[in-house]
Design a protein with these regions (language model features):
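Juxtamembrane loop-helix boundary motifs flanking transmembrane segments in multi-pass membrane proteins
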Residues: 1-9, 45, 95-99, 126-130, ...
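Short helix-loop-helix connector
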Residues: 89, 93, 124, 159, ...
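Transmembrane helix-boundary elements of multi-pass transport/secretion proteins
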Residues: 7-82, 110, 114, 126, ...
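Transmembrane helix segments
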Residues: 32-40, 156-197
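Transmembrane helix-loop junction
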Residues: 35-36, 121-122, 126, 153-157, ...
Length: 246
């Protein structure tokens, strides 16, 4: 990876206040507003009775990280709009380095979002022990984000900057609803069947590992693996299509 280009991308990311606010502050505000008003309530999640702030912290950690990774597409669309990607293509920068840096920056924002939600959760009395559960939960969340990194790169090379707002907002809302990130989905029925086939469901399950839920079974790994491969292929196709047009 080109260290200079990676450093430049990180600096541009930090200076992009709109992306930072949407990716980091929005999930944090949801947690504070909803968990704060229900901090004395409990909720049953697949047989686990959790305090509401605990449930909402692990759910919002996945949701916020998902927003952060898909929002990477908005940065790509903005770069395309001003011709930045065209300029990069006449430099020695390889396609592999370009994609690797986009993945790195997406994960960097996602980690910031997760860390903010953890701090807010602890401030609201969330207690998870032993400490290894925090590590296991975070590691599984990062694995579960792989499809969404691909989605962000895909839509960033496919859509215009004007289309990205509705696409990111609507897409993350739909994934959050079907994946049980806003509220627990039923253990049976059509919604449960649909949820198990999309990566946001397993991202939610990854967060729940921290509070005693079992880790993914084979189905979870298959869903994440298939979606990751499909989104990586689509991201590559969208990049080549965009390159050919320019």
């Amino acid at each position: 990876m080109n260290a200079v280009y990676a450093k430049y991308e990180m600096l541009r990311l930090v200076r992009n206040k709109r992306t930072f606010i949407f990716s980091l502050i929005f999930p944090l505000m949801l947690f504070v507003l909803i968990a704060g008003t229900n901090k004395d309530q409990t909720i049953d999640v697949g047989g686990l009775v959790l305090k509401f702030p605990t449930y909402y912290m692990v759910s919002m950690a996945g949701y916020g990280a998902m927003i952060a990774t898909i929002s990477g597409g908005a940065r790509i669309a903005a770069e395309r709009a001003v011709g930045w990607n065209r300029q990069l293509r006449i430099t020695p920068l390889s396609v592999r380095t370009y994609f690797a840096t986009k993945v790195l920056t997406s994960y960097a924002v996602a980690l910031c979002s997760i860390a903010l939600l953890y701090v807010a959760g602890i401030a609201y009395g969330v207690h998870i022990s032993p400490f290894s559960r925090w590590i296991e939960m975070t590691a599984l969340l990062l694995v579960g984000l792989a499809p969404f990194v691909g989605i962000g790169i895909f839509v960033g090379h496919l859509l215009t900057i004007d289309s990205m707002g509705p696409a990111v907002g609507g897409g993350t809302a739909l994934f959050g609803f079907l994946g049980g990130q806003w509220f627990p989905i039923p253990e049976h029925g059509a919604l449960h069947v649909i949820g198990q086939g999309i990566p946001s469901y397993w991202l939610t399950r990854a967060g729940q590992v921290g509070v005693g839920a079992p880790a993914w079974g084979l189905k979870g790994w298959i869903v994440i693996g298939v979606w990751s491969a499909a989104m990586a292929a689509l991201a590559g196709w969208a990049y080549r299509r965009d390159t050919a047009k320019q």
